[in-house]
Structures are given as C-alpha cells and as structure tokens.
Amino acid sequence: TGDLAEPGVAATLVDAVATRFGGLDQLVANAGFAARQSFSELSADALASAFAAMPGAFSALAGRARPLLEASIAPRIVAVSSFVAHRYRADAPFAATAAAKAALESLVRTAAAEFAARGITVNAVAPGFTRKDHGPSAGNAAAWAQAEQATPLGRIAEPDDVAALIAFLLSDAARQITGQVIHVDGGLTL
C-alpha cells in the first residue's frame, strides 16, 4: 500500500501482485482526489499533485504491468476518469482535477494504441456524480439535490453503476473495445 503519486509505489504494488498471484490479467487504475480550486486560485503545487496522482500513477502502473499483461490471455486495463474532464462548472471548481483527468484520458488512448499489438485493451470510464460512503445528510442534502437536478436522468449514479461498466470492460465481451472513454453519468456530459 502507499500513495501512488510517490515514485516507486506503483512498481512495488505491481511487483507484489505478480509475486502473490503469479501474474496479472487486469488492471484498474482508480487513483485520484478532488482538489477544489478554481483556475484563478490554481497553484503549481495543486496541479503537480493532481498530475502525479492521476496520469502519473496511471502511467507508472500501466508501464510496470505491461510485461505481465502481455503474458495474459485476456489482458485489460481500465482507468477511472471523471466528467470534470469534459464539463467544467464555475460553481464546482476542480481545475487541477479536470486537467489531470483529461491528461489521463489522453494517456489511455496513447497506451491503447501502443499496447494493441500485444492484445491489451486500454479504456477509461468517466463517472458523473456518484454516491460515496457519505450519502445525503442534513449538511449536504441540498448539494445532492442539485446534482440530481443537473443530471438529465434525474438520479445520481451508485458505485455499482460504475463498477458494472468496469466489469464489462474487463470481460471477454469487451475484447474489441480499446482506446475509449465511456461515460456513466446519466447524461451529464450531453
């Protein structure tokens, strides 16, 4: 365990998985955090942290995992992005996160192009508003209601909605899908 933004942590993690399980068939890169800063307030440190935690961690994980995935009969990589890479809102400023997730999606496409010859699929899912462990409460009920209202389907995604898409992309049914960013956002990015 450790912070994937730190040098060497991704390699240690992939190596530990390979040692424990004798290989690696699938990788889901879900590292990230939401730095609440507008573009006007954006600091170099916040931007660097976001890039280290998201596209940097993905690059380190996928790069280290590649030889193991090449030995698999059904190698898959799925990265978790976010709708913020596609829809910026002034009332919910996440400039560093938006930029980092957009860079992550670009790396997904780059890796897909480079890894395809070895049969490795590389895709991303981009969730919209998704309920977390701390669902609506008296302190945040208005924010959840606003998020539901902003989502064309009128509901917030559950973690299982996102997990189902990831599971599909890891399955044999998705063996012809690579280099894609698939939104699971209730129409938020329409």
Where are these regions (language model features)?
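Amphipathic alpha-helical dimer-interface segment in Rossmann-like NAD(P)H-dependent oxidoreductases
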Residues: A53-I73, A85, A112-A113, A117, ...
